[in-house]
Amino acid sequence: MSDLLTKRSVADIQHLIWLSLGGGSTECIPNVSYGFFREKGMEADLVYITPYGYLHEFEIKRSKSDFLADFKKPVFHGDVRIQKLTFVLPEALAGEWLKQWCADHYKEFRRSFDFWFYPEEGMLKRPRHYGADPKCKYDLEYYFTDEMVREIDENDRDLPYRRRLFAEERSALYRLCMIRFWNNPRRVEIKTAPKEQSIGLFENADEGKGEK
């Protein structure tokens, strides 16, 4: 029995992330596999190339079980090019359950990360960098106390030093992005689809093969 908490597709959520990062020429590449990453079994639902040349990885989850399964993997987003990791979760997971889960398991976290949340309609809800409220379930301070952050940061420091992408690595990601586009049977709809409709680059023939 499915425990999905959303009707939104992975492609739709990828599109929301792209829009939230600025849309337009924002450098986002969907569905990056172990062919690019050096660690066996590692893959990313979406990576964003930051203005400074690092990678920001987004892990999209559509159910509680899929989110929990990520923390049982032997490989946990440790590629040296990933500067930041974000879990993009259904809004239904925001709140007391996730807060208690973080409190119970933070000593096991192998690196720092944050949460973004998506509702069934509308745009992503992102944590505030300024004016964050520990009582707001969309801000990180709601989930992590200062003590928890310090301990997680200690684990984070054990990871290899992060580095910027080399030119050939950026080129490899651009090629992958083009493959995703031209292998998309619905690419012709991009020109006519409403701006907020999530089709095109972030939708591919593999959609639906696995639950997230």
Predicted regions mapped to residue ranges:
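Short hydrophobic-acidic sequence motifs that mark active-site Asp/Glu residues
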Residues: 43, 47, 55-59
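A generic local structural motif
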Residues: 14, 45, 70-74
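Acidic-basic catalytic patches of nuclease active cores, encompassing PD-(D/E)XK
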Residues: 1-42, 49-50
